[in-house]
Amino acid sequence: MTGKKSSREKRRKRSGQEAAAALAAPDLVPAVGGSGSGSTSGCGSASGCGSVTCCGNTSVSGSVTGGGSGGSCWGGSSVERGERRKRRSTDSSSSVSGSLQQEAKYLLPPLEKELFLAEHSDLEEGGLDLTVALKPVSFYISDKKEMLRQCFCIIGEKKLQKMLPDVLKNCSIEEIKRLCQEQLELLSEKKILKILEGDNGMDSEMEEEADDGSKMVSDVVNQQDSCVDSTSSLRENKQPEGLELKQGKGEDSDVLSINADAYDSDIEGPCNEEAAAPEVPENTVQSEAGQIDDLEKDIEKSVNEILGLAESSPKEPKAATLTVPPPEDVQPSAQQLELLELEMRARAIKALMKAGDIKKPA
């Protein structure tokens, strides 16, 4: 009995020492918590005793000192390592996603870097604010200066320098804007709209010239139509005037016919005399001089009669004078002028024909 008691006391002392050692080692405590709880078999293996009562007394210490508890400690450390790796991977993924733009700045070439920065900024290179509602360029067609400014904001200075030809590479932006403004002022709004729509400049010029030509042709046609209408209206107005003149001024036509007959007789008389005596040149000269004088007098008389300035002859009927009295201080009408011109032409033609007939036998 005394031997059993002494062995029990020794075991209790050992278990107390092991518990104190477990409390003294802080790194091993989380391993115990990570393993959940110690197994009774591990405690039995650590104590070297096969009895269950011994394991029940020192369940915590057995779990720490046993072989099984040692395996659980190693398993807990591996789990912690896995969790640390997961945390590192999540931290690295978040850091990669957060520093993607910074890494892209160093990895992309210069041109792609500019495009990347332009996409991730609210202000473009030329100063165009993307937060403001955009409007088409044709919206500013009434204000060409503002339209030019919007175009330069869209393009940007660096892009413009790349797009410029070699002739304008050395020009400043202000000078290029001034040149563009001068060229823009020369263009019409219609042509600017066609250029913005993508039409070729030559095609638009040809279309404008065709439009101008068609307008000119239409204007000429309208003028011709108006002239035709005016002439037709004049003719229609002249026809009743001619009838009135024929009806009301029968004495004028009679006088003209009488004068014409007298003129013809005057021309025929000297012609016959000249034909009868061709050998006498003096008579022919005198007859020609008298013919010219008679012609002038006859023309003056006919003009006065047509214009209504000559005195009415006593032989004219009174009814005619009553119906159409000779107007005084009245401008000649177009019909009267036409009649005068026709009579003078007819007499001139007759005179030329007679003169030709006189020269032939001579």
Curated annotation (Swiss-Prot):
Q: Where is the composition biased (Basic residues)?
A: 1-14
Cross-link Glycyl lysine isopeptide (Lys-Gly) (interchain with G-Cter in SUMO2) maps to which residues of the chain? 105
Which residues lie in coiled coils?
Answer: 282-312
Entry-annotated residues carrying Phosphoserine: 89, 121, 204, 313
Q: What does this protein do?
A: Anti-apoptotic protein that modulates a caspase-10 dependent mitochondrial caspase-3/9 feedback amplification loop.
Q: Where is this region: Disordered?
A: 1-44, 65-101, 226-251, 269-291, 309-332
* Any one GO biological process: negative regulation of apoptotic process
Biased amino acid composition, Low complexity: 19-32, 273-282
Under PANTHER family, the record lists: CASPASE ACTIVITY AND APOPTOSIS INHIBITOR 1 (PTHR14740:SF3)
Keywords, ordered alphabetically: Apoptosis, Coiled coil, Isopeptide bond, Phosphoprotein, Ubl conjugation
Signal sequence span is none
What protein am I looking at? Caspase activity and apoptosis inhibitor 1
Provenance organism: Bos taurus (Bovine)
Q: What is the lineage of its organism?
A: Eukaryota, Metazoa, Chordata, Craniata, Vertebrata
